[in-house]
């Protein structure tokens, strides 16, 4: 699996891995890069089955497989220890890694994640799957912003959304890959194991998230010992895109508290 590894801002700078949601694209974190790259060595990647790592996924594809793929790629690149910032599915990958490879994960920042899929989120995905089966990639892509962004934000950016739709359709990961990745997401359940997560953990949510209710992050914070929760009042599921300034401040402050070496080394 190909990783995009930025230069370290100085020797020994902490490594921060950025993991996207179901879309899988490393470009999802574009609005965060400038806010983080002066303090951390950033690693982004397209999830297997998407983008630069396109290709058919095996039967029985699971969250543990996703986490194992990322860990193996990081090891091959000589990265033994890292913090992970994950959005939705990316947050689940972070949880899996923190449990499977606790020696490697220095900290987690979990954005609009969950312990187990809520009935509301399951309903949303059922609707989206029906759209995929009935209308293919175009229907899936055109519906996606409704679950990601607040209405007023979308209404003010129609040309941008149309351009993003066209790009997403042209680079669509494929129906079979999407369904396998979605199935892995739906089956993930950390409700019995989250208490074993020992690394510092920041949880960020948005109060108006249509896809993943903010209450899921509150439950997650209760389950992970010592974790901290910051709830943004606005921004939707993709709050790191719609209100990047607020999100970046929260993330920078959280990473600085969890990874103090980033301050002391300078």
Curated annotation (Swiss-Prot):
The keyword Calcium does not apply. It comes from the Bacteria. The keyword Hydrolase applies. One of its GO terms (biological process) is nitrogen utilization. GO terms for molecular function: hydrolase activity, acting on carbon-nitrogen (but not peptide) bonds, in linear amides. Its EC number is 3.5.1.-. Pfam families: Abhydrolase_1 (PF00561). InterPro entries: AB_hydrolase (IPR050471), AB_hydrolase_1 (IPR000073), AB_hydrolase_fold (IPR029058), Pyrimidine_utilisation_RutD (IPR019913). Keywords: Hydrolase. It catalyses: carbamate + 2 H(+) = NH4(+) + CO2. Residues 14-119 form the AB hydrolase-1 domain. Belongs to the AB hydrolase superfamily. Hydrolase RutD family. Involved in pyrimidine catabolism. May facilitate the hydrolysis of carbamate, a reaction that can also occur spontaneously. PANTHER family: AB HYDROLASE-1 DOMAIN-CONTAINING PROTEIN, HYDROLASE, ALPHA/BETA FOLD FAMILY PROTEIN. This is Putative carbamate hydrolase RutD. The lineage of its organism: Bacteria, Pseudomonadati, Pseudomonadota, Gammaproteobacteria, Enterobacterales.
